[in-house]
Amino acid sequence: MKKIFLLSAIIASFSLQAQFIVSIQAPVDFKDHDAILYTLNGSKDIIFSKEKIKNNTWTFQYPKNYMGMMKVYFPDSNNTFNFISENKNVNIKLETQANKIKDVIYLDEANERMSNLQEGSQKKELILPALSQIKEYYKDNTEFGKALKTEISRLSRSSEGINPTQHPFIYYYNTNYSKFLSNDASKKVSQDDIINFIDKSNDMLETSSLLRPVLVSYLNTGGNTNVSTSVDKLLDRLKVETPRGQTVLSELIDIFDVYDMQDFKNKYLGMAKNLKCTITDRLASTLKSNANVEIGAVFPNYNFHIPINTNAKTLHDIKADNKIVIFWSSTCSHCESELPQLLAKYNDLKARNIQIVALSLDTDKDSYTKKITAFPWVNDSELKGWNSSYADTYNVHATPTYFILDANNKIINKPEHVGDVLEYFKVK
């Protein structure tokens, strides 16, 4: 009797600690020790906690109700993968090779179901049209023709229905993705349809990863000449004093930034700055990252990781009359064409005490190392791609991105292209 009571007490105690558990198994030779679990708010990953490996397994205890997308990131190897939560235990096994994730095996029902549905949907959108086009070149009585016909028939079948009671998030995601983001031309939705969806959705809208693409679709539906009208109509319905209104406002500011729609970005960034109500963490983050890189602001300092061509420990340690800070990547085609132009004028710039600091968004060490052998300026990289800390700190959405700083590290110019950099210093 005592044993039964003790076991019941342990179970009760554990259930108080966690609403659900995320368990991730890795092979013995996987070298990472730390894993970070993220939830989602709109398009922003939110850190929940960091755990250390124990018996080749990471175990996260999530204390609250959560339905939506989640992500685990391994900072040492820059591996990451996504999965879902339906407020039930999540069980995942990783297959790795050379310390990189080769495959993710979902062992819980919800993630296995979601994975199969997404795989089927992708094949239907991308592969089915191609198979249908090549079918006419093969006879049905040939071995390949028969296989082709079978695969077309399989992909053409409607997906098995999803029970919204058993799988509320899977139902929400797939139903609304199909309605608002499908490539099917017959499924046209109006701006009013999208406004109603955003306004009336439950909290799964913010955790689903659908919000950003749905907003882009909303803007596209309104057309380029009606952007302000469309946005004002949406925000008037949502009310920017509400958490959802502020999340949408934050997303729109980021969208305008990514697509270089500066006039609209400035208009709605100004609206956000002038709000007198309580600001959510989501909008506050957007305001901060934009404030960091405004003209006249002091460029936030950065601690170098493995800097090349300098003994300086931080960005501010580099003394110069001006600094050109570049965010770039060895795989960026625009960087490939623009950085050599800067290289051609490097000696002229250096003679005027103008230093260049290039921070890379690479992930592949070999690619980065080979590329920087040609660049005599200060180079550094975290080798974490868009997971690099400076992507958020400096509000970087594309490469290359340029900043020009004065001797006191104040931002005095934000050139669009390398030609603008050279024109600013009159070295073209």
Residue ranges, per PLM feature:
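Short active-site neighborhood of thiol/selenol oxidoreductases, capturing the structured segment around
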Residues: 313-342, 355-359
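N-terminal "domain-start" segment that seeds a small globular fold
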Residues: 277-316, 423-428
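Structural micro-motif
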Residues: 67-69, 376-378, 395-403
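N-terminal targeting signals for export/organelle localization
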Residues: 225-298
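Thiol/disulfide oxidoreductase modules built on the thioredoxin-like
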Residues: 386-426
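Bacterial Sec-dependent N-terminal signal peptides
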Residues: 1-25
